[in-house]
């Protein structure tokens, strides 16, 4: 491809709203243009990269035995009402009405549609197992689209759905997809980690995310420094404290604490360590009730763990000060478990405390030297805190370390979550009707492009992993429009490279060499060849790998050997 026949839309300016390097570089390299908040046009250069990623995904899905189909983007409300997600999914579901006042939505995902297909088409166990996938545009009405295509409203996604007769078959399909995902992200040249994850709005009982490791990632990846354990911090289990709780030493005492509203203020006032106090958070229950969650003073609540607790509303909702005062009689800064008039759940670490401090459920007063069972019943105990770096790994091997990650894929074991609600069944070999066991598997194709840039760039621009590069070789002539020899040599080498099967971008513009070099570095083509009069005099071509700082001279006759 010659640049004169291509749409190379590089720019020097960085948009004011572009914070991440990937967003800045995708705009500057001419890959994207913004249409509206969270909506982007993929220009020819960007589309080539997007298609490269989609091709790898498609090849590995086919290799794993999945069958490609294409479902409608617009879905009827009736299917989502059947599954119970029409209201539960929230404001990210863009709802619309047609001219006949029938409800529809733009699909953020396709569990309902594929389950509807399955219940119509699958009748017997003999038709199983099956795995369908599509690569298609999705839409989620993000409350705050940002970071370019990293968190946009419209995006390209690969979503797959497996159907099996029993749980064993579902688990086998899950493992097959898990392995396919590892192959996909390995082939794309990404540094990634598969981690245990919460199932979120999709549902199901078991899930892994595939996280591309990057400092700008929105997710916290937790891993052991001595084992294979890895999880999203939302899912990371805190190891239960070891040993019995020691006996109390001091007598409970009520102290005046005017103006004290936080653990730090209490620690300063009473000269105690934050880890020797507890904090009490009030959340809403399933049926308009309130529930207290109690943690050690130096720990943070894990919202995802909390919203899965029995009796706690999903998604998690915190009570406001008015609700707290009406139920308990004090403000949020004076809460504690002693004589608390609502049910409470205690984190496992907080349950081990002895002689601890807490609010007295009375403004400007706290208790010190409180002990479980002696002064307050312990009640329900659960793991509800966020792990912290340095915690013992849940598998008992090593310590937990943290990294930042960008989620590019997730796999789920759904079981019969959708098939039961939508009555998708098949008849087994004994003639008994059974709900289909499902799995679902997503990859954010457009997000993967941005994540790759976050891992692969420098001050000059993008450094594409070869499988994702829009072109393999950049051919840059020096003063070609003044030198017949340079043009002739370029034409000959260009045709040889094309005939050898390489994707080449020949910069045939009438531009200064520095401009051409800068553009080729910016768009990230892995290999660059420079032909000049002085080089031809010596029978050489200058070769430079994009990821290298140094160029080298290669014999004109042996250029192709560089790439073999």
UniProtKB/Swiss-Prot annotation:
Main location: cytoplasm
Reactions listed under catalytic activity: tRNA(Pro) + L-proline + ATP = L-prolyl-tRNA(Pro) + AMP + diphosphate
Compartment annotation: Cytoplasm
GO BP term, example: prolyl-tRNA aminoacylation
GO cellular component term, pick one: cytosol
Keyword list, A-Z: Aminoacyl-tRNA synthetase, ATP-binding, Cytoplasm, Ligase, Nucleotide-binding, Protein biosynthesis
InterPro entries recorded: aa-tRNA-synt_IIb (IPR002314), aa-tRNA-synth_II (IPR006195), aa-tRNA-synth_II/BPL/LPL (IPR045864), Anticodon-bd (IPR004154), Anticodon-bd_dom_sf (IPR036621), Pro-tRNA-ligase_IIa (IPR002316), Pro-tRNA-synth_IIa_bac-type (IPR004500), Pro-tRNA-Synthase_IIa_type1 (IPR023717)
Alphabetical list of CDD domains matching this protein: ProRS-INS, ProRS_anticodon_short, ProRS_core_prok
Ranges annotated as spanning the membrane: none
One of the record's GO molecular function terms: proline-tRNA ligase activity
Enzyme Commission numbers on file: 6.1.1.15
Pfam family, one: tRNA_edit
Signal peptide: none
Annotated S-S bridges: none
HAMAP family associated with the record: Pro_tRNA_synth_type1 (MF_01569)
Assembly behavior: Homodimer.
Family: Belongs to the class-II aminoacyl-tRNA synthetase family. ProS type 1 subfamily.
Function as written in the Swiss-Prot or TrEMBL entry: Catalyzes the attachment of proline to tRNA(Pro) in a two-step reaction: proline is first activated by ATP to form Pro-AMP and then transferred to the acceptor end of tRNA(Pro). As ProRS can inadvertently accommodate and process non-cognate amino acids such as alanine and cysteine, to avoid such errors it has two additional distinct editing activities against alanine. One activity is designated as 'pretransfer' editing and involves the tRNA(Pro)-independent hydrolysis of activated Ala-AMP.
UniProt free text on domains: Consists of three domains: the N-terminal catalytic domain, the editing domain and the C-terminal anticodon-binding domain.
Name of the protein in question: Proline--tRNA ligase
């Amino acid at each position: 491809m010659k640049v004169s026949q291509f749409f190379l839309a590089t720019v020097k300016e960085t948009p004011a709203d572009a914070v991440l390097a990937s967003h800045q570089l995708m705009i500057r390299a001419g890959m994207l243009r913004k249409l509206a908040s969270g909506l982007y046009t993929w220009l020819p250069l960007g589309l080539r990269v997007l298609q490269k990623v989609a091709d790898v995904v498609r090849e590995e899905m086919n290799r794993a035995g999945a069958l490609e189909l294409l479902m409608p983007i617009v879905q009827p409300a009736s299917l989502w009402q059947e599954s119970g997600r029409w209201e539960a999914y929230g404001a990210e579901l863009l709802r619309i009405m047609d001219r006949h006042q029938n409800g529809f939505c733009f699909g953020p995902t396709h569990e309902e549609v594929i389950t509807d297909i399955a219940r119509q088409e699958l009748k017997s166990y003999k038709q199983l197992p099956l795995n369908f996938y599509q690569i298609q545009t999705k839409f989620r009405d993000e409350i705050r689209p940002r970071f370019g295509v990293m968190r946009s409203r419209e995006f390209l996604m690969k979503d797959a759905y497996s159907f099996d007769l029993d749980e064993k078959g579902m688990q086998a399909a899950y493992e097959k997809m898990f392995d396919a995902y590892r192959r996909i992200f390995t082939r794309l040249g990404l540094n990634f980690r598969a981690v245990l994850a919460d199932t979120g709005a999709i549902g199901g009982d078991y899930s892994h995310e595939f996280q591309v490791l990057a400092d700008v990632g929105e997710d916290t990846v937790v891993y052991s420094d001595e084992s294979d354990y890895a999880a999203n911090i939302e899912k990371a289990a805190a190891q239960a404290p070891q040993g019995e709780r020691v006996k109390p030493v001091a007598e409970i005492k009520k102290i005046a604490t005017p103006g004290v509203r936080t653990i730090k203020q209490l620690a300063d006032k009473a000269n105690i360590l934050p880890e020797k106090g507890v904090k009490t958070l009030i959340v809403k229950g399933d049926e308009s009730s309130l529930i207290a969650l109690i943690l050690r003073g130096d720990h943070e609540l894990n919202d995802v763990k909390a919203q899965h607790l029995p009796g706690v509303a999903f998604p998690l909702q915190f009570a406001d000060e008015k609700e707290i005062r009406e139920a308990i009689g004090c403000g949020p800064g004076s809460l504690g478990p002693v004589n608390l008039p609502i049910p409470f759940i205690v984190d496992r670490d907080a349950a081990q405390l002895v002689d601890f401090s807490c609010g007295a459920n009375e403004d400007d007063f706290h208790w010190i030297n409180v002990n479980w069972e002696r002064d307050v019943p312990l009640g329900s105990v659960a793991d509800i805190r966020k792990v912290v770096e340095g915690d013992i790994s849940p598998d008992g091997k090593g310590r937990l370390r943290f990294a930042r990650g960008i989620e590019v894929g997730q796999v789920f074991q759904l079981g019969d979550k959708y098939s039961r609600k939508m009555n998708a069944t098949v008849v087994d070999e004994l003639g008994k009707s059974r709900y289909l066991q499902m799995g679902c598997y997503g990859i954010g194709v457009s997000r993967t492009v941005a994540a790759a840039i976050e891992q692969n760039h420098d001050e000059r621009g993008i450094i594409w992993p070869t499988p994702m590069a829009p072109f393999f070789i950049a051919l840059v002539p020096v003063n070609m429009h003044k030198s017949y020899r340079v043009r002739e040599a370029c034409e000959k080498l260009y045709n040889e490279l094309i005939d050898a099967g390489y994707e080449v971008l020949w910069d045939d513009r009438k531009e200064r060499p520095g401009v051409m070099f800068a553009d080729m570095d910016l768009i990230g083509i892995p290999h660059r060849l420079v032909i000049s009069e002085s080089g031809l005099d010596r029978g050489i071509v200058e070769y430079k790998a994009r990821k290298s700082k140094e160029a080298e001279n290669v014999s004109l006759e042996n250029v192709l050997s560089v790439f073999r």
